[in-house]
């Protein structure tokens, strides 16, 4: 029996913005005699809490606790009204959404949250001056795309405040996942007067933020290793928030988390590799599949080795994903041979999963890889050296060392140099396109297939690897506009786009679909694991006897 003395939560995650469901609770009755305080460890510092700029899922997990929007996800990842007081009114053609806000929706300073706060936040997101990496999220909103490229003013965005408590959105095409999309903190409101009063200091630390979610953050500034979450006393559903304090700190070493869990100093920590098998029968073990793609990304900048298609194809065919997941990781991850992970989207007309529909690409083929490698050597020379950018945590170490060994063994003359960096630096290097090979992952904000294909659209802020193909772009646009209401045609568009991306362009090498594995103190109940957006959610969590 473990002695639960210091109660701590540890988050360890791979990549950018997995599973679903929640622990069974014992009702909403607060346990008597237990101090409702926990601590949280994260593998990297929080990058930015400006919701227009947040991209990594680790930071976003905390942001989701601080900023609530019109809707939020329930324990089954179903969108339900948040700051909206009731379900949205949707026009028959699916193009107009009208939301009525809660009269008691307030900012953490007590000011009323208004429809104008949503207008401001959404306009700010698509404003080219903001340079928001997530601006594409509103591409379904009228005039958003034209505003993003500077062809129209932000005031033309299809959003309207009808008084203080009614917010209306005009779409250019129906979007089945729209309510899920607006449940993510990227589209939470911002208080214009407050933001502008802070100037460049907005979101630089906890003193220069306002909060609309169940918690506020204290004692945080960019780059700091520690911070504290406390209940937002102005939150409309304050009585449902049981935890009184969540202390956060940065811990990178998985071994450390497991050791502290076993001594009772942590009450939730993530597992991977051999630890999963070791603890699989432990009553505290919890596992669920992530809807995510972990991949090897190529920077195809002209004039660099990886601009060579033969080199990219040789690398793609020379990685044994079965061995990677079974031996190097051994944590429940599954090989992935496509851009889209399993269970992201299922065709409601025939229950066919897109991954099964689209088929497999870049499957391990050692001999074919060697043949293409010989062609690459004719183009580039016998000896080629490539740096591999990875995060400096346990997962990054395991994956990169496996890939290094596999490629150097299967492709004689290729040298892979691992360059580990803190995850925040990795993300910045990718944004700056300052890499050649990198390990990354993508976990979309909702179940829209387009959330993955946006990664490689020519003008996408996430297109770090300089992939560009006009046919791919046309198919991606057709799928989310012309064929948005016909899933069968949409599937066909996306399948053709995926083939161009992987079979023809070799833009990335899909590696695996990850699993999240935890040891959890059974005294924590009500903890939720959303399918989209964040790793977990503590709004309804509490400690029980």
Provide a role label for each language-model segment.
Residues 361-362, 413-426, 453-521, 545:
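Extracytoplasmic/peripheral linker and loop segments enriched in polar/acidic and small residues
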Residues 41-92, 210:
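N-terminal lobe/hinge region of extracytoplasmic solute-binding protein
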Residues 171, 175-241, 245, 255:
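Gly/Pro-rich hinge or "lid" segments in bacterial periplasmic/extracellular proteins
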Residues 114-116, 120-121, 166-168, 243-245, ...:
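Alpha-helical secondary-structure segments
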Residues 518-545:
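Long beta-strand-rich cores associated with HINT superfamily self-processing modules
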Residues 234-278:
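Ligand-site clamp/hinge motif
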Residues 134-193:
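Surface-exposed binding/hinge segments that line
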Residues 334-375, 395-397:
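Structural transition elements
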């Amino acid at each position: 029996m473990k002695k639960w003395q210091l109660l701590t939560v540890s988050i360890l995650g791979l990549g950018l913005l997995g599973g679903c469901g929640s622990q069974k609770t014992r009702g909403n009755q607060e346990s008597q005699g237990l101090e409702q305080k926990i601590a949280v460890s994260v593998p990297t510092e929080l990058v930015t809490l400006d919701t227009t700029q947040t991209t990594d899922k680790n930071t976003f997990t905390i942001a989701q606790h601080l900023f609530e929007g019109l809707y939020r996800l329930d324990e089954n990842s179903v969108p339900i009204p948040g700051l909206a007081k009731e379900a949205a009114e949707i026009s028959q053609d699916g193009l107009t959404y009208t939301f009525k806000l809660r009269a008691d929706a307030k900012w953490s300073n007590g000011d009323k949250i208004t429809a104008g706060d949503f207008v401001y936040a959404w306009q700010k997101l698509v404003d080219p001056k903001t340079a928001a990496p997530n601006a594409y999220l509103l591409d379904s909103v009228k005039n958003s795309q034209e505003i993003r490229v500077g062809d129209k003013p932000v005031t033309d965005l299809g959003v309207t405040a009808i008084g203080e408590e009614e917010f209306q959105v005009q779409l250019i095409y129906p979007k089945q996942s729209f309510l899920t999309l607006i449940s993510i903190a990227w589209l939470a409101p911002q208080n214009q007067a407050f933001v502008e009063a802070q100037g460049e200091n907005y979101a630089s630390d906890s003193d220069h933020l306002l909060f609309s979610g169940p918690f506020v953050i204290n004692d945080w500034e960019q780059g700091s290793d520690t911070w504290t979450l406390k209940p937002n006393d102005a939150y409309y559903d304050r009585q449902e928030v049981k935890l009184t304090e969540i202390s956060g700190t940065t811990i990178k070493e998985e071994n450390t988390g497991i050791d502290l869990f076993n001594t009772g100093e942590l009450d939730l920590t993530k597992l991977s590799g051999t630890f999963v098998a070791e603890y699989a029968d432990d009553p505290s073990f919890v596992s669920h599949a992530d809807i995510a793609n972990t991949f090897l990304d190529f920077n195809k900048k002209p004039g660099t080795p990886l601009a060579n298609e033969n080199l990219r194809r040789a690398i793609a065919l020379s990685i044994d994903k079965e061995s990677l997941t079974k031996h190097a990781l051994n944590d429940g991850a599954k090989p992935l041979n496509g851009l889209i992970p399993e269970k992201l989207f299922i065709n409601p007309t025939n229950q066919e999963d897109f991954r099964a529909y689209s088929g497999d690409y870049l499957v391990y083929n050692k001999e074919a890889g060697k043949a293409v490698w010989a062609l690459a050597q004719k183009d580039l020379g016998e000896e080629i050296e490539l740096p591999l950018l990875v995060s400096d945590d346990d997962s990054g170490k395991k994956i990169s060392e496996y890939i290094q060994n596999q490629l150097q063994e299967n492709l004689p003359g290729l040298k892979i140099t691992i360059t580990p960096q803190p995850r925040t630096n990795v993300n910045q290097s990718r944004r700056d396109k300052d890499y050649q090979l990198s390990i990354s992952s993508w976990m979309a904000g909702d179940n829209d297939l387009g959330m993955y294909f946006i990664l490689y659209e020519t003008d996408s802020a996430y297109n770090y690897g300089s992939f560009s193909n006009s046919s791919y772009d046309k198919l991606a646009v057709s799928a989310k506009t012309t064929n948005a209401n016909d899933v069968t045609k949409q599937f066909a568009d996306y399948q053709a786009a995926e083939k161009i991306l992987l079979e023809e362009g070799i833009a990335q090498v899909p590696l695996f679909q990850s699993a999240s594995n935890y040891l959890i103190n059974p005294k924590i109940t009500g903890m939720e694991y959303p399918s989209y957006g964040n790793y977990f959610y503590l709004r309804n969590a509490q400690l029980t006897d």
